[in-house]
Design a protein with these regions (language model features):
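Short beta-strand "wing" residues that participate in macromolecule-binding interfaces
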Residues: 57
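Acidic, low-complexity mobile loops and tails
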Residues: 1-54, 84, 88-122
Length: 122
């Protein structure tokens, strides 16, 4: 399945029973150079829309929102050592965490690429 997007500029990539989550090119571009990422704890459960982490850049700090309800199954430890991955490969190596959805239908309700492009004007 292709990526889905939120209005808060997170992306979701379904991968079997889990979904990877990160920030979009638009988000990392607006933030500038990312210098720190606070990730959620593995095993933490979140409702859709809850703050799940923080990304800090040279320009600002921004909350990372949980795009779907579920439980965090894995975090990207590489981001702790190299937060710039959120800039250099936001849709790949710069993923933030993986979540096991508690309401998988929420993924279908997120924006597709065309809707997100219309939102961001890109």
């Amino acid at each position: 399945m292709s990526l889905k997007y939120t209005v808060e500029h997170e992306w979701v990539r379904p991968e079997g029973a889990v979904a990877s989550v990160g920030i979009t090119h638009h988000a990392q571009d607006a933030l500038g150079d990312v210098v720190f990422v606070e990730l959620p704890e593995v095993g933490s459960a979140f409702e859709q829309g809850a703050v799940a982490g923080v990304v800090e850049s040279v320009k600002a700090a921004a909350d990372v929102y949980m795009p779907i309800s579920g439980t965090v199954t894995e975090v990207n430890e590489a981001l702790r050592d190299d937060p710039s991955l959120a800039n250099t490969d936001p849709l790949g190596a710069g993923w933030f965490f993986k979540v096991q959805p508690s309401a998988p239908a929420q993924i279908d309700a997120l924006m597709d690429e065309a809707a997100y492009a219309a939102l961001t004007g890109s």
